[in-house]
Amino acid sequence: MKLRLSTDEMLSQWRMRRALEPLRSDCTVERIDGIDLDSFLKMEMRDWYLNLLDTAPLHLLTLTDITSKISLSKNDDLSATIRLPQGCRRVIELTLDNSPSPVKITTPDTPLAICQQNPFCQSGAVSPIAIHSNNSLIIHAGSDNFNIVQLLCVMEPDEGLYELDEAALSLISQIP
């Protein structure tokens, strides 16, 4: 089941799964020179969540279709560029109207991406590719006569929200 948790709700889950709660209530100790444990845990929790968005299996994440939020600009070399919206962590699937299969998404340092610099090795409409770099996608599809049908991404939610599948909470490790 997909969850949408506030920072306080996620912090409560984080404390329980890291074995920091329930607290002992049979004694009280008060210190004024200690660390702000909640701030430390929130920072640790945020780092864990951003790593989850970047690396977790897709069934643990919420996918967003951002097709309506993007614009396509044509380049001189029959490629096209899409500027991705702020907060796009991962591009999952891109579908074009003139292609029988989804676009293969790669990074600039792969051999497939490097081949796109040679006009004799570039991808065509049958097997288009998109190079994901610096919040943009450069699409090589053999022509610039295409439209985007669907663009699925993992988006970072608004500040203070955590969107994930309930099963992802099991990935929170206890403090050793």
Where is each model-derived feature located?
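Glycine-enriched, solvent-exposed interface loops adjoining structured elements
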Residues: 1-128, 132-176
